[in-house]
A protein has these predicted regions:
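Positively charged n-region of N-terminal signal peptides that target proteins for export
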Residues: 1-7
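N-terminal leader/targeting pre-sequences
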Residues: 3, 17-74, 79-183
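Bacterial N-terminal signal peptides
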Residues: 7-17
């Protein structure tokens, strides 16, 4: 009788355990109350190029970018310091988000900007994904807020970032942009 009760309770225990993890290999589920902002990425002609999500966690800002319609190959992805994406060239987004006053690039001995992130590879279908953690960043408040008075934007560039050339890594033109906002 005890064995039958245990066997009947086992599926419920497995189900409860599954609810406490995400679908990404058993990692803890994301905190639904964690601050989050997102951006719809658009090309200069207004066509959709994907989305970006930034979530605040204990170790910094978790950035996820999903892109489409890109030229196959490497593309720089940066967070820019102004929440403005005026087409067609998106220069209204300003320079890279750099609240700490560093130089550009992970390979620069004086780097790196907080908005510097790894290059994204777009496949033959023009789609690409990139995930990165910005250590010490916050969405609001603290010494390094992403959303200051003039906001912030995510920008995809035409070429790869060389990770050292100041101020922008020789990444070429801005081909997609999205203003980060809550909601």
């Amino acid at each position: 009788m005890k064995i039958a009760a245990i066997l009947m309770a086992l599926p419920l225990a497995v189900l409860a355990s599954a609810c406490a993890t995400s679908s990404s290999g058993g990692a803890p589920a994301a905190d639904a109350a964690a601050p989050m902002v997102h951006a719809k990425l658009l090309a200069g002609d207004g066509s959709a190029r994907g989305e970006a999500m930034v979530t605040q966690a204990g170790d910094g800002l978790h950035v996820v970018v999903h892109a489409q319609g890109l030229t196959p190959g490497m593309h720089a992805v940066h967070i820019h310091m102004t929440g403005s994406c005026t087409p067609p060239d998106f220069t209204s987004a300003g320079g890279h988000w750099n609240p700490t006053g560093h130089k550009h690039g992970k390979d620069n001995p004086d780097g790196m900007h907080m908005g510097d992130m790894p290059n994204m590879i777009a496949g033959a279908d023009g789609g690409g994904e990139m995930e990165y953690v910005i250590p010490g960043g916050t969405i609001n408040g603290g010494a390094t807020p992403l959303l200051d008075a003039d906001g912030a934007a995510v920008v995809i560039h035409a070429q790869a970032d060389d990770n050292k050339t100041d101020p922008a890594g020789n990444a070429g033109g801005r081909i997609a942009c999205g203003v980060l906002s809550a909601g």
